[in-house]
Amino acid sequence: MPPLNTVLRTLLPIVSTALFYALFYLISSLQFDVAIKPAAIPFDYLLQLIVAYVLFALSRRLWVFVLLQGLLTGVLYVGNAVKISFFGGPIMPDDVYALRSLLLVLEGWHFIAAAAPLAAIAALLLFNFTLRHWSAYLASTIVILTGITLVYEPGAILQPLDRHFGNSVWDQRSNYLYRGATLYTLQEGARYFADAHTPPDRDLALSAAANLLENAMGNTTSAGNFTPRNVHIVLLESFWDPTLLEEAGYDRDPLAPAFRALWKQAGYSHAMSPVFGGYTANAEFEVLCGFPVVEDNVKFERQLLNDAPCLPHLLAENGYRTLASHPNVPVFWNRINAYRRMGFQTYWSKQDFLRDDMNREFLSDASLYRQVLEKIADPVDRGQPLFNYIVTYFGHWNYPLNDARPNRITASSSVDEVSSYANTMYYKSAELMTFLENLQARDPDAIIVLFGDHLPFMGENYSAYVESGVLASKRSDFSADMYRFYVSTPVIIIDGTRGPLKTGDLA
């Protein structure tokens, strides 16, 4: 009969897994309203238990094993709940590539809360790893075989899981809730490798492109005398019309009267964004390159590896100077490489701007606009054709304002973001109109495009939108009209002295 201590040690993963599973289930459901379906718990718990025994077999010290298991389980279950409550969907394999950008944008306790668990997991794994017992070699074999299968034969894992548990391509939240975090991670990890794209043969691709260009050139007619006009595109972070929240209880219109009047002249046109609450880079890609983003990942991070015939490239080939401005760190969303591959000759980022008017870590729009106007004054005055692309930084959650920008708008909503966002929009729209007045005075015949990149985050599980009845709390319950609402942001296109165009809704 084995000693009592040995029996207790062997049972430890069962007890610890049950306790951690229950703890993080309660946190996810009570704090974030993300509750895994009861029918999914047994199999998900079993997978989590297998992970626990593998970790247990490779551990030198029991207390470190328990701490490490708690951190891993917390990141897996609470991390998914946080992402679902903010963005409507769980963590996807491609989010690994966005992790660097997330850590770069976080500051203070937000950075510590995100980075500390990851650093602790890595350190504890190295500190506690051992191969002293036969069970450790068995656990290592399981890890290696699972990894090899996942990468080289993902269908062997994915197909039986899809048959038994199903898969909803359009509703990842439901996939998560009906599988549980561990099964979901395994299933979507296998799908990531199964769906990996095989790059086309280079010679075939070049031949196809040459044929396409030859046919296209043969069908075009001469443009005749072409007088280049400057083009200014301004992407407005989280820019949207708060008055669409009818239950917000605003005491006044958050949008500046001048902006409201200009947007009315444009027929209240809208752009349809591929993202909600974040992932600005995908909205940028669609605007600058004219191709849709069809996968749930950040296009700039690892899918823009070569030079692309996007608008900046085309204009540069026709004598334009192409400039991009965004007062964030240059590597965020891999912009430093993506902008170059799209054809921008110059990228002004954080180090190129004076941080003289900050709303917490975000440079104000007023300062950004003023500094960009100063930078482009020379080429505009010399008559050099210019493509000037600006991505604002101010407007990110949780919508901070400095002392020079006191709150002007009140709201009766119980969702904190409803009031803070409205005040942010008050200043964003007013500062935009001041910039527009100055820009048109200097460059009256320019083509100017203004658009919001996505709707703002307004409480967990779309709470502010749910409060006003414009969205459901889950994407799986959205109607067609709700989906349209979910992606629609203001857009204004100004044709020089001819004024704003009534474009309708643009996708």
Residue ranges and their predicted role:
Residues 1-175:
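Transmembrane and membrane-interface helices of multi-pass
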Residues 65, 69, 93-96, 182-183, ...:
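Short, well-ordered coil↔helix boundary/capping segments
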Residues 85-92, 200-202, 310, 349, ...:
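A diffuse structural propensity rather than consistent per-protein peaks
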Residues 92, 160-188, 241, 280, ...:
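Secondary-structure junction/capping motif
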Residues 96-99, 179, 183-186, 206, ...:
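Alpha-helix initiation and N-capping motif
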Residues 103-117, 178, 182-185, 417-425:
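Membrane-interface transmembrane-helix boundary segments in multi-pass integral membrane proteins
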Residues 152-233:
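Membrane-interface segments at or immediately adjacent to transmembrane helices
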Residues 214-222, 226, 233-236, 241-507:
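Solvent-exposed soluble domains appended to multi-pass membrane proteins
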